[in-house]
Regions:
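Outer-membrane beta-barrel channels and translocator barrels
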Residues: 28, 81-83, 138-142, 183-187, ...
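Short glycine/proline- and aromatic-enriched beta-strand/turn motifs that initiate or cap beta-hairpins
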Residues: 14-68, 230, 236-238
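Glycine- and aromatic-enriched membrane insertion/assembly motifs of diderm outer-membrane
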Residues: 42, 49-110
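Residues that define the transmembrane beta-barrel architecture of outer-membrane proteins
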Residues: 29-31, 66-70, 123-129, 143, ...
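Predominantly the C-terminal beta-signal and adjacent terminal strand-loop region
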Residues: 185-238
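Transmembrane beta-strands of outer-membrane beta-barrel pores
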Residues: 39-43, 92-96, 135-137, 151-157, ...
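Transmembrane beta-strands of outer-membrane beta-barrel proteins
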Residues: 31-37, 86-90, 127-129, 145-151, ...
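Outer-membrane beta-barrel translocator domains and adjoining extracellular loop/strand segments
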Residues: 45-52, 99-105, 157-165, 202-209
Length: 238
């Protein structure tokens, strides 16, 4: 919704000034550079297995809510053809995910809150290496919509080594997105919405550090698979 409102407002502004074609030769450059700032919503998809502890407890994990993070990238754009560009935009994504652990087998008489539910705040600082193919429509006055698709390498450099669930530092993601080039007098503004889907199971099942701590190990034992997902809203300045 936010992306649609911002895009409509910027497009309307560009159309109000469409009698003059801004930056007419911007798309003719073989290579150009830029940067972006934006926000991201990080999520993980958790597959629970119904593991039961020696005490008869069954825990499951979920991410019930999401909070926005911040992202910044630099951009190198290579023109392949009239409507095709290859874009490399390394950067950093900052965000967090709160995982809730619920004891679904806790009887009503259990009053200790830690026997009913716990939580884990997973803070992430991602170094990202996205490579995207940009497929653009023909320019209409001062706007030009486009779609993107690509892959993105992800490396988390802010891991807490004592987490209940420990996630791998590296991941690979498929990305699809949409946006619009808006040609302003001095630069091109490109709001873009991108969806990122993790390709690997990032859960680290081998936890020798928790062999003597079954109270912590039960959370890892209760989960079979964890995959990363993200929604990213960025504003490119080119």
């Amino acid at each position: 919704m936010l992306f649609a409102l911002v895009l409509c407002a910027l497009t309307a502004f560009a159309q109000d000034n469409d009698k003059i074609l801004n930056r007419q030769y911007a798309d003719q450059k073989k290579i150009h550079f830029g940067f972006s700032v934006g926000t991201n919503f990080q999520d993980i998809h958790i597959v629970n297995n119904g593991f039961q502890t020696e005490d008869g407890e069954t825990w499951y994990a979920d991410v019930p809510q999401h909070s926005p993070g911040f992202c910044v990238n630099v951009l190198a754009d290579l023109r392949l053809a009239k409507n095709f560009n290859l874009r490399f935009s390394p950067g950093m994504y900052f965000g967090n995910k709160v995982v809730k652990y619920i004891n679904s087998s806790a009887p009503d008489e259990v009053t200790d809150p830690l026997r009913r539910n716990q939580s884990q705040n997973i803070k992430s600082t991602y170094i990202v290496l996205p490579l995207d193919l940009k497929i653009s429509a023909n320019r209409y006055h001062n706007v030009r919509p486009y779609f993107t698709g690509g892959v993105m390498g992800v490396f988390d450099v802010a891991k807490d080594r004592t987490e209940q669930l420990r996630l791998a530092n590296g991941d690979a993601m498929l990305t699809v997105g949409m946006g619009c080039d808006i040609y302003l007098p001095f630069f091109k503004l490109c709001p873009e919405l991108k969806f990122c889907f993790g390709l690997k199971n990032v859960l680290q099942k081998n936890r020798p550090d928790l062999e003597d701590n079954p109270e912590m190990m039960r959370f890892t034992q209760s989960v079979d698979k964890v995959t990363n997902n993200m929604v990213v809203l960025t504003f490119y300045f080119e």
